[in-house]
Amino acid sequence: MIYKFRTLHQANSLSVTEEHRRFVADLANSDAVAAKPDMSSRLIPWGGFLRSTSLDELPQLINVLKGEMSLVGPRPDVLDWQDYPMWQLRRFEATPGITGLWQVSGKNRLTFRQMVELDIRYIESRSLRLDLWILAKTITLVLRKGNK
């Protein structure tokens, strides 16, 4: 289980969860931009602030302390492995991270395919130097976003 602050009202049925899973599965098999669906109608008070400042990710530090995540790594998966094309499974060879190469390389402007390719590139070239660069770039992006 990956910890995160709740930023949306809880879905009152499994259909919303299943709808999101299908949305991600469709993205995994397309070249569409990996933008999140609009869920602004379900935001709780402060949810937009937590999301826009990336503070909703802070509880994942618990996962890091438990050894379930790392600070830097591929994006955590939301689907069962069988929902991904075979070539994308390489991204599960590393512990998922709070931030990663995808997040600092254009995040919401990239396709799902580009996200996976960046995750795989990170796995193939990971090093302390790359991790430190990604962490520094993440901090810069979060602070810059907070000043807008």
Task: Tell what function each PLM region has.
Residues 1-148:
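Conserved small/aromatic sequence motifs within transmembrane helices
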